[in-house]
Amino acid sequence: MSDFEDNNPFAGADRRDSVSSDATDDGPSASFLATNTTNDFGGASFMAGGGSFYGAASQIGGLGGMGMSAYDPESALANPFDDGSNSFSATPTASITNQNDTAHEATNERTTTASQSNIPPIEIIEANKNHEGTSRGFITYTIRVGDVSVRRRYSEFESLRTTLTRMFPTLIVPPIPEKHSITDYAVAPTKAREDKDMIEHRQRMLQVFLNRCRNLPQISNCIVFQRFLDPHASWSEVLNSPPVSTLPRYSLRAPPVDPSNNVTEAHSYLPIPSANGVVRNRGGDEEGKQEAFFAEAEKTAKEYEAVIGGGLEKVARRILKRYTDIAGDYAELGGRFNALSLEESDSRMAATVEKVGQAIDSNYLATNHLVRELGRQFGEPLAESAQFSGVVRSVLKYRKQKALQLELTSDSLEAKRVTLASLESAEADSQRINDALGRTRSNNGPSTTNSGEQPSASPAPKKSSGFKIPGLSSLNSAFNNMMDADPEASRRQGIGKTREQIGQLEQALEVAQKDIVVANESVEKDLERFRAEREADLKCMIRAFLKCHIDWAKQNLDTWQSAQAEVESM
């Protein structure tokens, strides 16, 4: 038995590539939100891609005053991205520090009806550049919860989400808006950091993220989330204090629920399975059906992400770009008609041409606003939906690795038991041989010569020094070290170590069996919640998409009918 096998309880079993997950930390004193300071843990994992419409949605500036009513916020499925009381009343695009309040109100209305959280609806009221401790500066987002405000950076939102995924590995933690691409930083790093459209997009989506977290009892009751909203809490201290600082380095070597408090010594014996491993098909038993259910859920999430992120989103983005181009053409055409009206000597004809030019200008403004509202009410939630699919796949991946962990532990335990049986059998055979030799010697007795005199002692033979190659002393030493001088002692030592490893694996198997039951129940429950939420969000997106186009078409129809009446009255 090699040194590796001596020290590794999983040696001799199926060895698969290992995958690890890293840690972060969490924090200090009581929060102003500490209405419930109990740590409630439950689950989630990493995030995935998905594009954004914020660029196309705001490539054109603000508008003048069109009177299109937006999607009704009184609906039970009120869209968290819908601007609630927002109308197609063309106000200029809000500055970084003065966002359109109606978007925040709509989000709050949705989250208030969807949750019984003790935390009031959350708003991000502004985004400002801050120069504290640096000459270059950074953007901070002002979060308002009731009468209390706190400023946080994007990187702090990012670390919050990472921490939540480690604390709740079986929970579908909402995604946050994407980072800048490497290309953006390479081309114009300063512009990438301070891009107004990106900041406004992040402001809206970070508010959606916080309110979605607020709707999840596990997160809203979590002290880490409450301290994130506490203006008196230092976030760096939160990340370096319990419960975050007590989270294990590898989430797979911890229980699925409350991993910062419920870790046992047995968890340290668990293997880290490959992320690409396949759970064995157990046929028609209950466990087999459950594995089939999760495999189908993973397949569906992957297909949904491909349909949304790789298909629908790209096409919708192209359409928004075309609307943007058309709006620009309408603006130019309206100006040409107005110039033409000034050239007309007939005042009646000049007024008619000017009326047509005004209709075209109105069409430009309406199309401009359509692009912006489609980006906010349809594009942004669509991109978030693609990100959610990636989050679901990450949670399912964690659950699958927990199932693989159980299989690996069971296989390793069985292999070690076979090894122990083999060693014990060899030890028993060796003992029988030694006993037989002992009996043979005792039966023969000491031999004597006929004269009764002891024979003269012959010189003792030289003790063999083992394997030798003349002139190669170092090589001789290496070979001699490899040769087992006392195989019986080595075998007994191997038996002792194998028994110890079997004891560790039996403990590991027990916690692995408990963990997979908890993980399966928790993931399945959260998948049901997420599916209902996704269905409601999809209805909101479709309704918003239809409403934006209907209001845009009605506004244009009224404008062109007014122009037609002017022309026909000539």
From Swiss-Prot:
InterPro entries xref list: AH/BAR_dom_sf (IPR027267), PX_dom (IPR001683), PX_dom_sf (IPR036871), PX_Snx41/Atg20 (IPR044106), Sorting_Nexin_Autophagy (IPR051079)
GO cellular component: cytosol; endosome membrane; phagophore assembly site
Annotated SUPFAM superfamilies: PX domain (SSF64268)
UniProt subcellular location: Endosome membrane; Endomembrane system
Biased composition annotated in UniProt, kind: Low complexity: 455-464
Region named Disordered: 1-31, 81-115, 429-498
Amino acids binding a 1,2-diacyl-sn-glycero-3-phospho-(1D-myo-inositol-3-phosphate): 153, 155, 179, 202
Superkingdom: Eukaryota
Keyword list, A-Z: Autophagy, Endosome, Lipid-binding, Membrane, Protein transport, Transport
Alphabetized Pfam families for the sequence: PX (PF00787)
Bilayer disposition of the protein: Peripheral membrane protein
Signal sequence bounds: none
GO biological process, one term: retrograde transport, endosome to Golgi
Ranges of compositional bias, category Polar residues: 84-101, 440-454
Location of the PX domain: 98-236
GO molecular function, one term: phosphatidylinositol-3-phosphate binding
Role according to the record: May be required for cytoplasm to vacuole transport (Cvt) and pexophagy.
Entry comment, domain topic: The PX domain binds phosphatidylinositol 3-phosphate which is necessary for peripheral membrane localization to the perivacuolar punctate structures.
Matching PANTHER family: SORTING NEXIN-41
Family: Belongs to the sorting nexin family.
Name under which the protein is recorded: Sorting nexin-41
Gene that this polypeptide is encoded by: SNX41
